[in-house]
Amino acid sequence: VSQALGVLTRIYAAELRYTMKRNGLRTVVVLALTIFLLNAPVCATASRLQDTCAEARDEVALRPEWMRILHDTLPICKISIPGSHDSGSIKGGHMLKTQATDIPAQLRQGIRAFDIRLEKKGNKLGVFHSHAFQDIYWEDDVLPAFIHFLQTYPSETLIVSLKKEGGELRDYASLLSVSLSSPEYQSYFVMDFRPELTLKDCRGKILFLHRDHAMNNYPGAACVGWEDDSTCLLTLRNKDGKEGVALLEDEYQYESGEEAGKKVGVCVRNIEGMSAEPVSSRRWGITFVSATGLPLGTPKVFADKVNKPIADYLKQKNSRNCGIVFIDFVSEPGGKDLVEYLIDSNVCAK
């Protein structure tokens, strides 16, 4: 009976989430009461269902405007910014899936840095992870979602890394330059990068980090010297030649999930290096918590072994000024812990 109730509970929980989006309060209340009646007598006696009840209550915290309380004068490079690695990759199977929630949900959760991988599909740029098309387009879905969010929450700023995932560079550049040159979007872009950019400079706007050349008059910064599968110093270059430097950690390829401890170590070292920068420093920090060790060390395997230990370490050390941190499965328990810590650490930002 307990097992059957557990299955039924999960079905009702899924229906509740769907109903909250589609129907009115009355239906939601009915479903909620039903779930409560199903779980109340069982949670007290069955530890397995007790865990299920706890998980049902453990919803993702919504932080749609957490930057609002931060001072305008705070340099962007001194903010701990949670990001999602391969932000649009919710399809493609265990080997390619890196997120469990879509980009609008990530925005509401408090994610402020996005890793967008694009490839020409038809006459538009589709979002891909390797060969897996994610059934969304940059022009139709992703960029409009960013703009709409900033219109709703103008206190926020977004950092968007753009990368050509496949196809020809000329196709990528041609299509991307059209959207980035659109007059209707110009006021939502940070047009010129400076290492000393403040939150006031960027509120209500997107700061682009270009990993591939798209256009000469690009908004944001070009990433120069991004070494594959390594930790290095990265140059962030404005179109007029003005430069900044970032501590970059992007070591993603491992033999298997058994090497997750190594990944934790390199991430912590990069974040702590950024955190230890002098108050006057305008050096940026970019850390990718994501990794794979295929075939068995999938992104989810690594996320489960890496996200929480890093969050726990940062909490223990009370680390601040952590820089931009790209995370797999931001809505899962370990990912949520890391996202929440990074956001909350800004209360005492230098």
Locations of regions flagged by a protein language model:
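Short, Lys/Arg-enriched N-terminal segments with co-localized hydrophobic residues
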Residues: 1-19
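Bacterial N-terminal signal peptides that target proteins for export
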Residues: 21-29
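Bacterial N-terminal signal peptides
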Residues: 29-39
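Long, acidic (Asp/Glu-rich), low-complexity accessory segments flanking structured domains
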Residues: 45-111, 122-152, 157, 285-350
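Conserved, mostly hydrophobic/aromatic
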Residues: 117, 160, 208, 325
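Active-site groove signature of glycoside hydrolases
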Residues: 156-166
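Acidic, His- and aromatic-enriched active-site or binding-groove loops in soluble protein domains
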Residues: 180-194
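C-terminal active-site rim and adjoining tail of enzyme catalytic domains
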Residues: 209-350
